[in-house]
Each structure stands twice: as structure tokens, then as C-alpha cells.
Amino acid sequence: MSVFAGRYAGRCAIVTGGASGLGKQVAARIIAEGGAVALWDLNGDALAATQAEIDATHVVALDVSDHAAVAAAAKDSAAALGKVDILICSAGITGATVPVWEFPVDSFQRVIDINLNGLFYCNREVVPFMLENGYGRIVNLASVAGKEGNPNASAYSASKAGVIGFTKSLGKELAGKGVIANALTPATFESPILDQLPQSQVDYMRSKIPMGRLGLVEESAAMVCFMASEECSFTTASTFDTSGGRTTF
């Protein structure tokens, strides 16, 4: 994928789920294109390794479902970066892959706590820093599962549908304030999150993609990096697909 030198010059970003997968890929591109990044992730060891690898300015090991931890991290990262222009919410889990009537209640709640409540906490605590400067770009990671629903993935599908609705509301609230908020709705792409799923579920999701393959993390990262840039200036409260033709709405 191409690197656009200077696209993020002077810009400062917070990336959740930044130690691996899409979050790491996006953070690396923002840094390569002139920006500064604070990484948030639950995995402290992976976070330290990624910081050393991509030269991130600041890191915070936290659970995004802990509101107090997110509030503290937002203040610490804003201080370390000097400001916050960009928020990429990429932290998430898949949960169990079973029918609704067999879904463990605690597992369902955990998926909602991380994928939806945690994303809300991150947006809630970071947006005020953007409003102070009259500029911001927010990318919340949703999924085609939030549009269509995947069988045996009710918690994940529900959480991502919530992210889409949440982001549409937020984008409208921020319209005219210099802060743009959109959601990415990818189909399944190669990333560590697939390790949480049985191969049968991965095969099912691949079969739904007209292009006949899983996406590459670099492909979704390229879309996110457009969404998080100044170039994305007249689209807000919307969704961007990287689905290989699976969804067209």
C-alpha cells in the first residue's frame, strides 16, 4: 500500500486496539505519514513491542470497558501528544460462536461491554479534546455483521450494529463543529481476531464475500487512513465498506 508522505503532519491520534491487527497497521501508517500516535491496548507486552517497532509517542495498557481507566487515559494521552486530532476505535472481541439459546450470559455481556460500551467511553472522553480545537476525525470499527447479522455471532453482530447507530448519532451531533465521525464496516479480514473463531465460522464468512477471499488488513487500513485524514471532509455519520462486495448499502 502507498504511503502519502506528510498527510498527517502535525496531527495526533489515539488508536485503541493498537498493539496488533488493524489498529497497529493504521497507527504505523499515521506515523509513517508524519503523525504522532498514542496506542491503547489490553495486552501490555504486545503494546510495548509495538511501541518499539513503530515508534509510538505514548502507550496505555487498559481495558476499554473500564470507564475510569479510559477517562484517565484520554487525559494522559492528550497531555503526552499535546492535543488529540484523531480517534481510531479498533479494540474488540468476537465472543462465543453458538446459537442465541446457548449463548453464555456473561460472554454476551463482555462483548457488549468491550465492543459497544468501551467504544462509547472512548468517544465520550476524547471528543471534548477535539471540540477544544475545532477539528477531529473519528473512525469507529464496526462490521458487516452489524448490517446483516452473522449466525452464531449474535453478541458480536448486535455490538457492531450498535456501533453503526452510535456513530450515526455522534456524527450528526458533531456536524458543523469541525469533527467528523464515521464507521468502518469491513467483511472478514486477516487479523489476530480470527484466532478467537472456529475455522467453520471463518469459512462461512469467507463464503459470503463475492470476491471469494478474506480482506487484507492493509486494505482496511488504507480506508481508515482516508477516513481519518483531512481529505474526508464532507462525509460524516456514515459507514465505509471494505467488504469485497458483500454489502452494498
UniProtKB/Swiss-Prot annotation:
The alphabetized list of GO BP terms reads:
rhamnose catabolic process
Q: Which SUPFAM superfamilies match?
A: NAD(P)-binding Rossmann-fold domains
Q: Mind telling me which PROSITE patterns this protein's record contains? A: ADH_SHORT
Keyword line:
Carbohydrate metabolism, NAD, Oxidoreductase, Rhamnose metabolism
Q: What does this protein do?
A: Catalyzes the NAD(+)-dependent dehydrogenation of 2-dehydro-3-deoxy-L-rhamnonate to form 2,4-didehydro-3-deoxy-L-rhamnonate. Does not show any detectable activity in the presence of NADP(+). Catalyzes the fourth step in an alternative pathway for rhamnose utilization that does not involve phosphorylated intermediates.
As for family, the record states: Belongs to the short-chain dehydrogenases/reductases (SDR) family.
- Write down what this protein is called: 2-dehydro-3-deoxy-L-rhamnonate dehydrogenase (NAD(+))
Organism taxonomic ancestry: Bacteria, Pseudomonadati, Pseudomonadota, Alphaproteobacteria, Sphingomonadales
The encoding gene is LRA5
